[in-house]
Each structure stands twice: as structure tokens, then as C-alpha cells.
Amino acid sequence: GNIDTRIRKLNSGEYDCIILANAGCTRLGFNLNSYNLDFLTPSAQGLICLQCLKGTDISKMLNNFFDKDKYKIHKLGMDIYKSFLRNINADCNSAISVRSVGKGRIANGEHKLTFQVFGKNEFFSAEKTHSDPQKLIELATEEFNRNNAKKLLDEHN
């Protein structure tokens, strides 16, 4: 539902709590009694993908705005993110947030992988950095396994 409906349900006691995006509430003029949570946003949040026929006027125009270096960094980050999720048998519906960020402007630069795993009553957070994407995935997977984070994910199944 929309924000009005959610707030009404909260105030009527139908909900114990709700989680809303602060940016949206502020933009819509809601002044709420709230608490800001510090957590990772979903990977690729705000990413826009376009697909068009090669050689068309629109593809030529878009190519002028397209930063190939940034694309390589974001693509590698998403590949790292997806590989890590596969390694830990998680998917986009799992109670985990993962962010892979490239340091610098080149695709083979150093990357940082941060993840948060949410159980019902606790969570685990870790961050790993390495210049080799495959090694980074291995380090993050080892950290996940060493800290029994799978147990937290399994609480939701």
C-alpha cells in the first residue's frame, strides 16, 4: 500500500512497526516519529538498464553519455555480488544485503565486499577487500562460513 495506508495501519495497531524510506517520506512531506536504521541498501539500487538496437540513432546518442569505465566497475561489482550469493546458496529473496564497491576508476582496481546477514533477533556484518575479484569472493565466503551466518539466513526458511 501507499505511505498513508501504512501509517494508518501502524497508528491503529494493525502493525507493530513499519520500515519506510526516509527520502520518500521527506519528499512527500511526512514528518514522522522515526528511528534511522544503518544498513546496506540493496545491490544495484538505482541502477537503470537500457537495451536498444545497435547502430540506431538512439544507441549512438546513448553511447555519447555512456562511461565505459564506470560500466566495467559496476558490472564487475554485480558479478562479485552474484557469485558471492551463489557461493553461500542465497538469492535476492534471502535476508542478506551485499555491496561490492570498486576503489578507483578501473575495473581491475581493488574491490570491497560488504555484507550483512539478518536473523530474526540478531545480525552479522563483515567487510573484505582484495584486488582479485575471485579471491575477494573466497574471503567473503570463508568469513560467512566461519561465523555461522548461514544459521541466521536459515531462520527465515
Label the model's feature ranges.
Residues N2-N157:
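Small-molecule-sensing regulatory modules
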